[in-house]
């Protein structure tokens, strides 16, 4: 099986990568079948041989995750939605919904408490007013 992968080169701690097509059983920095591009993560420079990449992809070459990301950014393949991304978005949506329900519940409880307090204050005030208006019989 042919893989599209990154082949490391450069100084220590200053790596650059060549995008290569190679046999899936060969070493990371082994001899490639074909060099298809270049990627420098420090400067974000990317050069891709679009025609050769399309040819290799049509032949059934499988890109690694890092190469797939580069190809998506380069516009050579469509962005794929991975199952983990879908699950993550669903979890975030469920959490937001639960937080909204909790906030609405707390707001309703606070409103009910405020209404009960206002009602108690009004009853106490009317009771005080009724006691003051009644004539004192002695």
UniProtKB/Swiss-Prot annotation:
GO MF annotation, one: structural constituent of ribosome
Keywords: Ribonucleoprotein, Ribosomal protein
Region (Disordered): 92-138
A Gene Ontology term for the protein's cellular component: small ribosomal subunit
Domain of life: Bacteria
GO BP, sorted A to Z: translation
Entries under Pfam families matching the protein: Ribosomal_S16
Ranges of compositional bias, category Basic and acidic residues: 94-122
Family to which the UniProt record says this protein belongs: Belongs to the bacterial ribosomal protein bS16 family.
HAMAP family, A to Z: Ribosomal_bS16
UniProt protein name: Small ribosomal subunit protein bS16
């Amino acid at each position: 099986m042919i893989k599209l992968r990154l082949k490391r080169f450069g100084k220590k701690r200053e790596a650059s990568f060549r995008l290569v097509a190679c046999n899936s059983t060969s070493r990371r920095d082994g001899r490639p079948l074909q060099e298809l591009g270049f990627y420098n993560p420090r400067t974000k420079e990317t050069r891709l041989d679009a025609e050769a990449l399309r040819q290799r992809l049509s032949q059934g070459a499988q890109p690694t995750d890092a190469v797939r990301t580069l190809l998506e950014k380069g516009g050579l393949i469509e962005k794929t939605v991975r199952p983990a991304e879908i699950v993550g978005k669903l979890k975030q949506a469920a959490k937001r919904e639960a937080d909204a329900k909790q906030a609405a519940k707390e707001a309703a409880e606070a409103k009910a408490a405020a209404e009960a307090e206002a009602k108690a204050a009004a009853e106490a005030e009317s009771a005080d007013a009724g006691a003051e208006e009644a004539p004192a019989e002695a």
